[in-house]
UniProtKB/Swiss-Prot annotation:
Gene Ontology, cellular component aspect: mitochondrial large ribosomal subunit
Subcellular location: Mitochondrion
Cleavable signal peptide: none
A biological process from GO: mitochondrial translation
Family: Belongs to the universal ribosomal protein uL1 family.
Transit peptide residues according to the UniProt entry: 1-81
InterPro entries: Ribosomal_uL1 (IPR002143), Ribosomal_uL1-like (IPR023674), Ribosomal_uL1/biogenesis (IPR028364), Ribosomal_uL1_3-a/b-sand (IPR016095), Ribosomal_uL1_mit (IPR005879)
Function: Component of the mitochondrial ribosome (mitoribosome), a dedicated translation machinery responsible for the synthesis of mitochondrial genome-encoded proteins, including at least some of the essential transmembrane subunits of the mitochondrial respiratory chain. The mitoribosomes are attached to the mitochondrial inner membrane and translation products are cotranslationally integrated into the membrane.
One Pfam family from the record: Ribosomal_L1
MF term (GO), any: RNA binding
Subunit structure, interactors included: Component of the mitochondrial large ribosomal subunit (mt-LSU). Mature yeast 74S mitochondrial ribosomes consist of a small (37S) and a large (54S) subunit. The 37S small subunit contains a 15S ribosomal RNA (15S mt-rRNA) and at least 32 different proteins. The 54S large subunit contains a 21S rRNA (21S mt-rRNA) and at least 45 different proteins.
Organism: Schizosaccharomyces pombe (strain 972 / ATCC 24843)
Gene responsible for this protein: mrpl1
Protein name: Large ribosomal subunit protein uL1m
Chief place of localization: mitochondrion
């Protein structure tokens, strides 16, 4: 005899004796859910994307086209593992293009402006940054203006925007840098061992959201596979949340 427990559209099979053993113990709910987790590839309450969006939309208080979905990818690793960081260009973009600052002179400056950079210049740009509250989220430099960077190193460094050769943000090839910055979104692993990133608007169709989620999870796995060192880092759980709504564990491939 067995007890069939239905969770959403998923079903988990426990023997009748297992069910009774858990039911008669203290902390039944917590232990029962834990046992379900061990018998499944996903957390016990994991849902498909359509199931999750149904609940998230019903409890979110944001206007549909203003609120966003947030994906949280929990990583399985240890303290010796390097931190993961990368970029992704979503198949269905939904965020405003970032404001870009470029230190360059002459033809390189003209090219940067044509490509869509917000602030471009050399000595004049240094003065603006020192005296005006310019807002930008990306910063690059051409070698012909790199010597000016020490003058704004403290201001840019505190915002993690200081261009450097090591990070590839000082280059005589500005076109790929600017084009990538306008279409791709950066992500990085936080101190809690998770990667959190918006993946779409509440007005997205399930198909659009599903494709963005799959793209991000695949991108993160590719990034994890390239991490240096012998410590293996993998995806542990994936949760989807919305503006002012709870996080729901997702089934994922």
């Amino acid at each position: 005899m067995s007890s069939l427990i239905a969770l959403g559209k998923r079903q988990t099979l426990l023997s009748h004796n297992e069910f009774l053993n858990f039911k008669n113990q203290k902390g039944f709910c917590k232990r029962f859910i834990s046992q379900l987790n061990k018998k499944s590839n996903f957390p016990a309450l994991a849902m498909t994307v359509p199931e999750a969006t149904k609940y998230l939309k019903s409890v979110s208080i944001s206007v549909p086209y203003v609120g966003s979905y947030m994906l949280s990818i929990a990583l399985k690793s240890n303290r010796r593992a390097p931190s993961a960081r990368g970029q992704i260009a979503f198949p269905h973009p939904f965020q405003e293009p970032p404001k870009i600052c470029v230190f360059a002179k002459g033809a390189a400056a003209d090219e940067a402006l044509k490509l869509g950079a917000t602030y471009v210049g050399a000595e004049d740009l240094v003065k603006k940054i020192q005296t005006e509250p310019l807002e930008f989220s990306k910063c690059f430099a051409h070698p012909n203006s790199a010597e000016l960077l020490p003058q704004v190193a403290k201001l840019l460094g505190s915002k993690r925007l200081m261009p450097s050769i090591k990070r590839g943000t000082i280059s005589d090839e500005l076109k790929p840098l600017i084009e990538s910055a306008l279409t791709a979104v950066d992500y990085r692993q936080n101190d809690a061992g998770s990667i959190n990133l918006p993946v779409g608007k509440l007005g997205f169709s399930d198909k659009e959201l599903q494709e963005n989620i799959e793209a991000l999870v695949s991108n993160v796995r590719f990034t994890l596979a390239k991490l240096p060192g012998k410590v293996k880092v993998t995806v542990k759980h994936v949760h989807l949340s919305a503006s002012h709504a709870i996080a729901i564990p997702l089934q994922y491939k």
